[in-house]
Every structure is written in structure tokens, then in C-alpha cells.
Amino acid sequence: MRLHYLLFVFLILFLVPAPGDTFIPKSLRRFFCRVRGGRCAILNCLGKEEQIGRCSNRGQKCCRKKK
């Protein structure tokens, strides 16, 4: 039974996005952006937003309102 918990932890660690990782598919990047309270901006974030990540390798940025 403890093995299941260990495997679950490794699965979560594998799916959590790390800065600069390119092996994460674009759909997962968009999902994690929305989970963190952000949105995918095509070019730049708006003036009242901050960049918290990337939605794609081609320039889409994950932005959310500044706190």
C-alpha cells in the first residue's frame, strides 16, 4: 500500500511544471497557467499584470493580476 503513495508522489512531481522545461505539452502548460490563476497572453502581459510563466515556446506568456 505504501508503494502506491510513493508512485503517486513521483507522478505529481513529474507533472508539476518547472521553469524552462520544454518537455511539457502546450495543453498542460495552459492548464497549469489557469490553475495558478493566470491567462495566456499572445504577445505581452497587460500593465496591471505580471508574468508568472509561459504557455508555449513561441512567445505566449502566462499572466495574472499583480497582488
UniProtKB/Swiss-Prot annotation:
UniProt entry tagged with the keyword Signal: yes
Record-level GO BP terms: cell chemotaxis; defense response to bacterium; defense response to Gram-negative bacterium; defense response to Gram-positive bacterium; killing by host of symbiont cells
Keyword set, alphabetical order: Antibiotic, Antimicrobial, Defensin, Disulfide bond, Secreted, Signal
Role, per record: Has antibacterial activity.
Name of the protein in question: Beta-defensin 14
Cysteines paired by S-S bonds: 33-62, 40-55, 45-63
A Pfam family per the record: Defensin_beta
Stored SUPFAM superfamilies: Defensin-like
Principal subcellular localization: secreted
Entry superkingdom: Eukaryota
One GO molecular-function entry: chemoattractant activity
Cellular location(s): Secreted
Keyword Cytoplasm: no
Record's signal peptide: 1-22
Protein family: Belongs to the beta-defensin family.
Cellular component annotations (GO), alphabetically ordered: extracellular space
